[in-house]
Amino acid sequence: MKYIFEVRMKDGYTVEEYAEAWIEASRVIQQTPGARGTDLHRKIGEPDTLLAIAHWDSKAHRDAKDDSRSARVKAILEKHARTCEITPLGEFEEPEWRGGGR
């Protein structure tokens, strides 16, 4: 299962600052049962916009995560709420179809 969201930096906050904090929070979140990693992709032509993809074993695993268990993760998420526009794009199944090349 993939949880995908777009992140746009507000004025005065950089992608690098976001990514540094995101990596720190991800280290804690990845200790959650069912967590399978996260990826950040910078949007071509819009360097202050990222696509984030969180990989989970299932929707139930993601729904069960508790970000409040870590004061540091909670603080990072609260800061991101002030410094970024975060737009959830949705929850997606694993790929059903794949093209060639990988």
Regions found by a protein language model. Name each.
Residues 2-9, 39-70:
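Short, well-ordered beta-strand segments in beta-rich or mixed alpha/beta enzyme
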Residues 18, 28, 45-47:
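Generic alpha-helix initiation/capping and coil-helix boundary signal
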